[in-house]
């Protein structure tokens, strides 16, 4: 589930107040076609570009395909996968896609069924670097050959990174007043953001997410502010039917805090 949060800070020194309102616009996503021969191992992964659609064929002789892409700047990525409807009666898994992968699996894995003409992963925030995609044809495809297409979509936006699941690995949220985008993949997924205040002042935050119509009026997110020891200072929940939830404006001493 994709969400975004913005934190506003007002520092108070004597009678003066200053508010950080820096903003940044996302770049437009461009889509085009590309051609590449898949690699058969992690070490021989084929290089692909971002925001580019690639096509390949899975067969008995080419069951596993490896690709890699490089991000020169941190941002949000999402893998999109498509193929023709391959059955009128069964939706058995036809491909397994490991996104942000290594030899042992992926940060995100998606199964695409015979009738699933389109699949996509959650959006994931990543630092600059090189990352891998593994596409594996499952048993139902080994009797013949089948085509698929995919792309890795990139957005240049201020976002979380998917290693921020504890205080020790928290993302450093330096742009107070600017919206940061993240995603929650399960009920056990937790994202941490580090906030540093140089002076005593006030803090407030706003959480936005899409409505979840199947579970109206139940809590879907919990947002807490805690100190460096993990002690909770303030907690707010957001329901499935609320697209935007705002915290109260509360005072904090100078120091380091975590959202």
Feature-to-residue mapping (PLM):
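Non-catalytic, beta-strand-enriched accessory regions in extracellular/secretory proteins
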Residues: 50-76, 119-122, 132, 178-202, ...
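N-terminal compositionally biased, intrinsically disordered segments and leader/signal-like regions
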Residues: 17, 22-24, 38, 42-45, ...
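Short amphipathic, basic-aromatic surface patches that mediate peripheral association
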Residues: 81-88, 204-214
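C-terminal edge strands of extracellular/lumenal beta-sandwich accessory domains
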Residues: 2, 10-15, 20-48, 67, ...
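Surface-exposed beta-strand/loop patches in noncatalytic accessory domains
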Residues: 86-118, 152, 183, 213-243
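Short loop/turn segments at connectors of secondary-structure elements within structured domains
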Residues: 73, 77, 89-93, 142-144, ...
């Amino acid at each position: 589930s994709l969400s975004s949060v913005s934190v506003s800070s007002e520092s108070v020194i004597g009678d003066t107040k200053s508010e950080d309102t820096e903003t940044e616009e996302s770049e437009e996503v461009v889509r085009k076609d590309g051609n590449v021969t898949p690699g058969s191992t992690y070490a021989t992964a084929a290089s692909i570009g971002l925001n580019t659609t690639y096509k390949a064929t899975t067969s008995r002789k080419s069951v596993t395909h490896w690709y890699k892409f490089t991000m020169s700047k941190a941002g949000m990525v999402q893998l999109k996968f498509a193929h023709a409807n391959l059955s009128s009666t069964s939706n058995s898994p036809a491909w397994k896609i490991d996104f942000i992968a290594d030899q042992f699996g992926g940060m995100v894995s998606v199964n695409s069924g015979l009738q699933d003409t389109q699949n996509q992963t959650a959006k994931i925030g990543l630092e600059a670097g090189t990352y891998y995609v593994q596409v594996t044809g499952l048993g139902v495809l080994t009797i013949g050959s089948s085509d698929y297409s995919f792309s890795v979509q990139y957005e240049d936006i201020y976002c979380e990174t998917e290693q921020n699941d504890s205080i020790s690995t928290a993302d450093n949220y330096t742009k107070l007043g600017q919206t940061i985008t993240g995603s929650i993949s399960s009920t056990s997924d937790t994202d941490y953001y580090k906030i540093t205040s140089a002076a005593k002042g006030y803090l407030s935050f706003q959480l936005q997410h899409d409505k979840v119509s199947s579970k109206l009026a139940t809590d879907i997110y919990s947002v807490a502010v805690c100190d460096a020891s993990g002690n909770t200072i303030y907690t707010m929940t957001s329901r499935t039917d609320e697209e935007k939830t705002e915290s109260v404006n509360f005072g904090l001493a100078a120091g380091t805090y975590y959202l």
